[in-house]
Amino acid sequence: MKKWIISLFVILILCGLRFADPWFLDMVRLKALDQHQRNQVSMNLSNLATVEINNQTIRKLGQWPWDRNRVANQIIKLYQAGASIVVVPILFADPDRFGKDDALARVLKKTPTVIGQIPSNDKSNTGVVRGVATVGEDWQPWVYRYPGVVGPIPKIAESANAVGMMVIAPEKDGVTRRMPLVIASDGKLFPSISMEILRIAAGDVSFQMKTGIAGVEKLRIPKYKMIDTDANGNIWLDFKWKTPVYALHEKLPDLTGKIVILSMTASGLESVVSTPVGNIHSHDLIAASLATMMTGRNITRPFWTDLAELAASGVGALILTIVVLTMAWYFGAVLLPIFLVGSFYGSSYLFTEY
């Protein structure tokens, strides 16, 4: 009888541990998700492409930074190759030292080009604000807030049809698995660069956000499906999507109808981010978030999963206890890894199929 009482206490402790959900259990879940991501079969995207400014491009076209007339000419080159939208994830926060801002402003005004801005710890706010319709509860306790936003210089900001936030949200271990679709500063909402790409692709002037009592629930561009997010407005990135990559200095293929991301991969200019599938360039995060939203199959963690994990932990602990107390300890030693492997492959099946 004493053994059963002790076993009951052990079961309660294990269930209580799962209910408390300490950080190391969260890390176990994240590492399991990482493995599921790595096990996925890569898939190509037909409507996205990446054009690199790499070391060979710099050698052929000249050192960086280019004057903005040259940047404008390269954007025109991409549209001449058939691009429907060109994404330039670069911050133009200072006037061009060569005085060529007018050339870039003219191109931005005539084309559906998307450029970037960034959050800042300084309180100065030069960011471009986008219209948003909010529904439901107050979003301010949930959306990531920053003291300020650094945007393009006024001449470029006024000419650009789309300006989006370039921001990531690394987890506790420094690995990026999610991307904020919206951030806040000074009581205003700023969409991510991915949201701005979707907005300009749909021809809409604003975006929508729904917030519940437990945080942000969904974001939406009117002509696209609802985008499920976590409580902070983040989207889980699906890294199985791959885009064709070309070099800017080479002859470009037919890019008709494609969203083209102009990316910096030259040594010293590249931005590398740690992800579950290894170190990748920051423009790959933009592509992954776009693909996740456009396909309508973003990764979510339903509210009932915590209850399911708690119930599974309790049932598993109970079965192990009964086996050990009525048979022998080594039967439990065999059963435990079977439970662990089964739970991993069960979660892998749910991740892949649902």
Question: What is each of the regions a protein language model found here?
Answer:
Residues 2-223, 255-332:
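Non-transmembrane functional regions of envelope-associated proteins
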Residues 135-142, 232-235, 341:
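A general marker of short, structured functional hotspots
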Residues 209-251:
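Substrate-access "cap/lid" subdomains that shape
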Residues 239, 263-264, 354:
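Active-site proximal loops enriched in glycine and acidic residues that flank catalytic Cys/His/Asp
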Residues 320-354:
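Hydrophobic transmembrane alpha-helices
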